[in-house]
Amino acid sequence: MKKFLCIAFIALSQVLIAQDKGTVKGLLTDKEMSNEPLAFANVLIKGTAIGSTTDFDGLYSFKVPAGTHTVQFSFVGYKTIEKVFTIKAGETVTLNQLMSAEEGVGLDEVVVKSSTSKEKTSALILKQKKAVAITTTIGAQELSVKGVSDAEGAVTKTAGVSKGSKNVVVRGLGDRYNSTTLNGLPLPSEDPEYKNISLDFFGTGIIKNIEVNKVFTSELYGDVGGANINIASKELIKKSLLNVNASLGVNTQTVSKEFLTIDGTNRFGTQKASISVNDLSKYSFRNSFKPHSQDFQLNNSLSFAGGKKYDVGEDTFSFFIVGGFDGSYNYIDGNIKQTTSSGEIFQDQSFTKYEYNVSQILMANLQYKFEEGHNIAYNHLFIHNNKQSIGDYLGFNNPEQDGDLEFQRRQQTNNNELYVNQLIANYKFTERLDFKAKGSLNFIRGNEPDRRTNKYLFRDNYYSPETSSAGENERYFAKLEENDYAAKGKFSYKLKEDEEDVSTLEFGGDYRYTERLFSATIFNHDFSSRVAIDIENPDAVFSQSSIDNNIFELETGRGGASNPNAFVPFTYRGKRQIFAGFGNLVYQLGDNFIASVGGRFEKIQQRVTYNTNIAQSAIDGASNLDRTYVLPSFNLKYNFNENSILRIAGSQSYTFPQFKETAPFKYQDISFSSQGNPDLKPSDNYNLDAKYEYYMSSSELFTVTGFYKYIQNPISRSEIPSGGNTLTYLNVGDDASVYGIEIEARKNIYEIEDKDLKIMGGLNTSYLVSNVNLDANSVAQFTNTTSDLEGATPFLINADISINKKYNDNTFISSLVFNYFSERVYSVGTRGFANILEKGIPTLDLVSSYEFNENYRLKLKVTNLLNPNFQLSRAGFNGGDNVVLSNYKKGVNISLGFSYDF
């Protein structure tokens, strides 16, 4: 890496070209706010991508080629002003401007409509252009135009990013290789099964912008191989704001179906999670096995946002609050299969699944700005998510006799709460030295209360509970508590007084401590012989009278009533501590070349202790990891001219196993089970990127990126043939590689200014190749010698086209958004089992909105128009056809929304 850095410095230094330029600078003030400085306004040279945005003090400054130019000053809801000026090489021209509201627009309306330009596409493209590191930023404006409703939809519209089974996959690297931050502070997952929080919690109402950092820099935590996704939460910019949003919608294959719901749940997602049984001779569970039913399902959401700014002498205090409720139904039917290692199908069942997802969110931002460049802010985020599902499965499943059928019903609720508290302070010591301090206290409380699973054998023309294993009919209670603490401090020192020179020295430190306690209690029903059961009234058998009459015995996962430890839950406890220090030097070598070199030191300790339901885990097991990392990084930026940029970046990072990936707790699903691996080792990642950017205008660009990743000890999800077809996590080889190319373009296709008509298009696509040489000596006994990485998508395309038409005070926007990803590996096969593959699918969404008089807005959204099949399949045995293991459709979602700005 050092050799490459030297070569890059020498090569780029040889092509530095001096250009004759001058500096234009000035101050923008706000007539509507008593001539106060106007922050975040756009200042652009007309017809080019040259420009800047004003800072908090209304100031701007940038270099332009010598000659005569037209400068445009603009801000949302304000008049756009143009000025012609002439500048000579080495000259500084000062252009100050007083900005005012558009004619016929009152101050209150301006306040409602205005938003920070850090949400606007043009401003974020300028930010991307000026940045030293390679990054992609998506603002609230672009999300609205493309009909994106949350952060997950946003990042999957960027090159090289696709949606995975839970979260996103970046350049072929899934959940464990990525990281998520909120305002630059680490954010834990709301779901113990995953490292990253589900991005669909973050609706556009709370997003200012989203940064996708595919290149590691020293300020980031080192546990990232794919990308860091940083969500910047909204804050109040103008004097006041109040709006409400509501929508109703349907799913085409759900709306009129008879829909089953779980006893003990409700539409708000609140229920009792405690265990009501403390005596195995008493059947005192609160909830019934029999579900309820309804026949009309209407999706609904309601949200509000409000805030106000107060002057406190010469200082400013502001608050901003967002709240929301969302409930959605989904009905799917399909088929599941399982095979032996030789490809023989032993499970083939049709299924219907009823899903209801409800969430509530509350975000608050309090901010106090004092003196010049000083501010302190408190951010709070509360997310409650409740997922309820009932799955019915009918068919054969490893039958003992010809004609045997099995009916399975699984009723599951996952209830998770996330509490985020952040304190962020910025202090400016001098014009060249400032300090930023951040801290967070995050808490997760999750439970899976009373999951009910039944398996009934159909033989001799009647159903009976399975007698082969007591665990075939169970009630499962799980609870998770996690506390996460983080702190960060960073000094930034500007090395030169020249405002245009970006040379800066940054240094600081991080601390993070995370602790998790997971516990699960399982109740099994041990039937000694077959007994007839009405599957529509199972509580007639699962009752106190059946225990009294010795039809079944109630026991826990640890044994029956005679076991003194019967009620001791299965547990694992995880603790992780990270100490880090970092430094970064940005140095400008002339007008065209900037180099950034950084390093990060991390000391990480992780201990997972467990007492679980896997026999070989022993009574008290432990998985300990203790690592020290020194992580170098560099970024080189060369401007051929104002609109043409080349960037090169390299870094080293790592991927650390998560708590649940090392804890050998077995989690049972319908056709798979999963468990951790206490022998899992971290991965080391080496990353190299080269990116060319061409800016056609302030809102148009074309980029090409080539990337290469080398991973030592890569981690993949792998299948181990055992009871229930178990998935686990393995270091699948000594090394793996991923390389590919990404192309992105944004273009104004057609525009008639005097008719206020604009048609815009966006396209990004990626092609990648991944390979891992599987460890032939592994105890996993991999079926193949090589494989693609789990989740690696060879081909990915995102495209959108939008039309924007204004009619006097009304605005119509409509967008068509397309996405496609090709087939990819879901899990790596072992011991004769072939890889499980996830079928590539296309999606197409239509989003239209109509704004009336700047206060009222109607929005029509139709998603998943193509309604493709979602499939998992196992690669064919000895070159035969793939066996489809799971197949279903999700239906088309249609919603109509209304919003009002007060």
Please identify what each model-predicted range represents.
Residues 23, 287-391, 419-420, 430, ...:
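Transmembrane beta-barrel wall of Gram-negative outer-membrane proteins
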Residues 713, 820-827, 849-902:
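C-terminal beta-signal and adjacent terminal beta-strands/loops
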Residues 706-710, 729-824:
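Gram-negative outer-membrane beta-barrel transporters
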Residues 117-118, 126-175, 184-202, 206-218, ...:
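Periplasmic N-terminal accessory/gating domains of Gram-negative outer-membrane beta-barrel systems
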Residues 185-186, 386, 445-447, 464, ...:
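Surface-exposed extracellular loop regions of Gram-negative outer-membrane beta-barrel proteins
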Residues 29-34, 41-44, 75-76, 92-141:
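Short, acidic, small-residue-rich periplasmic hinge/interaction motif at the N-terminus
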Residues 403-424, 566-577, 625, 654-711, ...:
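Outer-membrane beta-barrel signature, preferentially recognizing the C-terminal barrel domain
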Residues 202-245, 901:
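A beta-strand signature from Gram-negative outer-membrane beta-barrel systems
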